[in-house]
């Protein structure tokens, strides 16, 4: 049975300046976005993206992720706590970022970028969809290093079951790593390959929505659920699972629309 290594959350400390692993994982996510974005632009030159446009996308995306992710954590998961401690809302370095909030923040940011650049919203989301999952993987690895978002109790016979000593002595699923592998690496492989060929408008975005929503919904059964505003709607389903449902529904609707558009030619 494995035991969590209890990493020091600070990766580098020089005097009073400390760089945390969680921040480095965000930096890695942003670097991967640029590297993959340029590779995607090279393999699909007809899409009309260049290095400057990708850098602009990153700037808008970073703002959307940070602002939306934090607001999502505040509104979806801990509204009572943050109403009592409003100064903590700005303490993003302590963790506490909601994917679904960050996702909505990025959508708003991409719409704003589209207004400035003259590009269509779905043209933008279809381009960035293959670039996002590796960043999600990096974020989940950051969660694992931080020792947060641990899994539900697991059978002691499970070879990779892990004890998180600061929680209890029970073997648990390392759900952060499940999510890094699933909604990170597996989803990246699916969307990256799908986006390699010309697709109808909205189709790549649809595959991302369906893939992420489905994989996250399943992963939540292995992760200790976070208390949230939808936690009590149906026993056994978490707030994150409820937030994944509209992602899948919208994704299916977009895929159907894209298929009809292709059929009409």
Curated annotation (Swiss-Prot):
One Gene Ontology cellular component annotation held by this UniProt entry? plasma membrane
Q: How does the protein associate with the membrane?
A: Multi-pass membrane protein
Q: Which PROSITE patterns match?
A: LGT
Entry EC no(s):
2.5.1.145
Q: Which organism is it from?
A: Azoarcus sp. (strain BH72)
Organism classification, top ranks? Answer: Bacteria, Pseudomonadati, Pseudomonadota, Betaproteobacteria, Rhodocyclales
- Give the record's family classification: Belongs to the Lgt family.
Q: What is this protein called?
A: Phosphatidylglycerol--prolipoprotein diacylglyceryl transferase
Q: Does the keyword Transmembrane apply?
A: yes
One biological process term from GO is: lipoprotein biosynthetic process
Q: Where in the cell is it found?
A: Cell inner membrane
Its gene is lgt
């Amino acid at each position: 049975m494995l035991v969590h290594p209890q990493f020091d959350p600070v990766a580098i400390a020089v005097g009073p300046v400390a760089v945390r692993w969680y921040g480095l994982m965000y930096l890695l996510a942003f670097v991967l976005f640029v590297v993959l974005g340029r590779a995607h632009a090279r393999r699909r030159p007809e899409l009309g993206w260049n290095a400057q446009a990708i850098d602009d996308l990153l700037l808008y995306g970073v703002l959307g992720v940070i602002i939306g992710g934090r607001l999502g954590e505040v509104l979806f998961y801990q509204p009572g706590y943050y109403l009592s401690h409003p100064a903590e809302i700005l303490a993003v370095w302590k963790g506490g970022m909601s994917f679904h909030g960050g996702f909505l923040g990025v959508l708003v940011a991409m719409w704003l970028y589209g207004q400035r650049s003259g590009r269509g919203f779905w043209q933008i989301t279809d381009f960035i969809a293959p670039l996002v999952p590796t960043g999600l993987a990096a974020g989940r690895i950051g969660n694992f290093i931080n020792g947060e978002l641990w899994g539900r109790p697991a059978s002691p016979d499970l070879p990779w079951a892990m004890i998180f000593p600061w929680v209890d002595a029970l073997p648990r699923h390392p759900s952060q790593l499940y999510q890094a592998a699933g909604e990170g690496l597996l989803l990246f492989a699916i969307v990256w390959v799908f986006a390699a060929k010309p697709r109808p408008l909205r189709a790549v975005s649809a595959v991302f929505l369906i893939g992420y929503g489905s994989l996250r919904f399943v992963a939540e059964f292995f992760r200790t659920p976070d208390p949230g505003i939808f936690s009590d709607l149906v026993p056994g389903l978490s707030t994150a699972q409820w937030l994944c449902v509209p992602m899948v529904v919208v994704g299916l609707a977009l895929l159907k629309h894209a298929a009809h558009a292709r059929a009409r030619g």
